[in-house]
Amino acid sequence: MPRRRVSMGAYTDYSPALMTDMYEYTMLDACLKDGTADRKCVFEVFTRHLPEGRRYGVVAGTGRILDALEHFHLSEGDLKFLSDRKVVSPETIKWLENFRFSGTIKGYREGEMFFPNSPILQVEGTFGECTLLETLILSVLNYDSAVASAASRMVSAAKDRPCMDMGGRRTNEWAAVAAARAAVVGGFKGTANLLAAQIYGLKAIGTAAHCFTLVHDDERQAFRSQIAALGENTTLLVDTYNIEEAVKTAVEVAGPQLGGVRIDSGDLASLAQRVRNQLDALGATNTKITVTNDLDEYALAALQTAPVDSYGVGTMLVTGSGAPTCAMVYKLTEREGADGVMTPVAKKSKNKATVPGRKLAFRSYEYNLADCEHIISGSEKALAAYQPNPEWKNLLVDYVDHGTIDPQYQGHDAIMAAHEYRAKALAELPITAQSLMKGEPVIPTETTVL
Amino acid sequence: MPRRRVSMGAYTDYSPALMTDMYEYTMLDACLKDGTADRKCVFEVFTRHLPEGRRYGVVAGTGRILDALEHFHLSEGDLKFLSDRKVVSPETIKWLENFRFSGTIKGYREGEMFFPNSPILQVEGTFGECTLLETLILSVLNYDSAVASAASRMVSAAKDRPCMDMGGRRTNEWAAVAAARAAVVGGFKGTANLLAAQIYGLKAIGTAAHCFTLVHDDERQAFRSQIAALGENTTLLVDTYNIEEAVKTAVEVAGPQLGGVRIDSGDLASLAQRVRNQLDALGATNTKITVTNDLDEYALAALQTAPVDSYGVGTMLVTGSGAPTCAMVYKLTEREGADGVMTPVAKKSKNKATVPGRKLAFRSYEYNLADCEHIISGSEKALAAYQPNPEWKNLLVDYVDHGTIDPQYQGHDAIMAAHEYRAKALAELPITAQSLMKGEPVIPTETTVL
């Protein structure tokens, strides 16, 4: 697959610069007036907790943030809108005219595991430029990581059987594209979504719908038509009327070389067993069985002993299997004071207090298995002097250096690298991570304030 | 607000034509080869059940489908992609070159209540053109209606207090735009999302974030700055450090004309009560109190007696408050046979069987309250001869007539009309609809097959 540079068409007419909450612009306006907009700042993205009972999360979406950053500038239409609605003052409009993010971004890799308080993304720049990114960064990371985290659990539950994204119809049409990408980061092997396949170079997969059988005069004609168009290696949908008859017809029409059959209703385990035996008896021993129908990780685990070859997962994938968002937040942790010195800051809101200071993040291992997430916080000076254990894994990579994006984290190759990385990082966690039993995060997070 | 025609920039480079599952195109390919692609068809969108315990759903998104239809044609890039990936044959590429939907669409209004089996959308055209729309139509209706349905419950629970969408950061960045629109259909009064405000002409609202207080040397300077930029009618965030001190500072800085304060943490009801008393004691009797912090319809109901003036709702709005999708499906119900006669069809899949034949839909009333949803199904001829009770409300309106879109259902005015319509339609349901207790749909759906 050739490496594809992504240029989100969505951002051509509507830039991501207005994919934001109004208060980001009104705060910018006030801070430009009083001079604090130029203060150097560090913002960090983290979540206070994983969804109930989850053992780990999987980071996804960072590459999409980089794509969006490339287009994060205001069009004439955007400026006119902000001006007409009096969202900001004319002076701020002027400031926004040539806006480009010129800061630095570090963070966890896509496909990396995360835990409560992991500093998933760290954005450093002036207050003005960092605050404008808040909503967009959170939208991307909260949704994509929710999908990747659910996908990863499903892939574990499916053991070595491939999982395919078929969930586009059950979420917003653009979320569907992001979900397909995040599913692959989370371990899925392909997607039914053509736009995701086009934009990100993903493998596209598909079978047929019940309407295809119904529009034909009978099932035999439908199967004949599909094989004529797609070849005998196609997958025929066999549960429109009567599964046993459909399987018989399918093998009669395609011959024993038939690629596969799909079952989309009923008791999937016992139906798969019956269909497998029937296919074998008909000589179609290499014909694959794929099943679909509101699958989640628990259903996949229950199907482990059934003779199924692959899974199509829809609703529960794109809605994060009960956790459709990650509760990630974007918080100011350090800023320049009136004296020009960088100072750790934190809010003290009840149950929502934050840890002041920028963070370093490492993972330690014992017998090749992760045993702790170490978050080190402190002043710029203290962190510069800090010597981590050399055997720890440094979890922060450099995404953007003073406005320059590292392209290795964008496009198709980055997604496939994240796909591989997830499998490796998951294998390095205690095996309890792969349990579907509800429990605590599989490793503790220790925060050290220097 | 001037009426805005919507031209989704997202569709300029990436047309909605690839926001679809691959099998729609492979089915088209097979059907073009065997001649069934030209068969006249009727597809219908419905859900088999509401989310557990919900009394009704609210339709939203149909106007966005019309926007997408205007752009539903394949660019050269799209055709090249389908060709390079060998998704379809060269003959099908040719057919797709000038593709425009030329069929007819009827359906429920946006803002209308729906129940199990309500035919929310009815798409009539050739098999080829109708099948290509499946995924996109479902993506839009499933997500937008999930948000509008949750919004409607929240608005009921909030009584007359305005609810504002602040959820953009907790869902995909484009889903956020759709969610803001759907929230207004569902009864919300405004959104923090600027792009939604721009595209759909919605009211934009906002306060300030904790980082705004933190970037300043102290809270007093932050409040001064915000008032200098936005005037004393602005809303100050008072829970960064200590709420009581912040309220005192706020009134000192702004004077008793201060527009509002926002509380985002802790026990909102008791804090609102304390803050109200403090504000009144300081003479700021007209200063409003807005609260935020993972609100859902249950939290809003619990706040009914607290002195709160408005609500900012985030996560639970954009994730459908536990039901992030509506389980709507798009099923072939009638098609032309080899003999040219329209014939009702249905699949017989276990637990997923469908009712054959196109549907009419009416709601009947007793003492001005809805008492039944009537779904009438049958052959084209039987339906043409059918005489409904003249007192029933006909639930299907004409959206598209042979490819021509009725513009009254697009843009800002259509959203505001849907907003009004929802309030009226909800008031016509038995009051149990507004209960948050789990239960059955508030009126039964009766299906009659002629």
Question: Where in the sequence are the language-model features?
Answer:
Chain A
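Short coil/turn segments at secondary-structure boundaries
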Residues: 80-81, 149-153, 167, 434-441
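An N-terminal, globular interaction/scaffold subdomain
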Residues: 66-72, 107-110, 114
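Short acidic, Pro/Gly- and aromatic-enriched capping/linker segments at domain boundaries
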Residues: 105-111, 392-395
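Gly/Ser/Thr/Ala-enriched C-terminal appendages of enzymes
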Residues: 2-39, 52-54, 282, 287, ...
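A residue-level signal for beta-strand positions that form part of recognition/binding surfaces
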Residues: 42-44, 102, 163, 329, ...
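N-terminal, Lys/Arg-enriched amphipathic/low-complexity engagement segments
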Residues: 41-97
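Buried, small/hydrophobic-residue-enriched core segments of structured protein domains
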Residues: 2-39, 49-51, 87, 93-102, ...
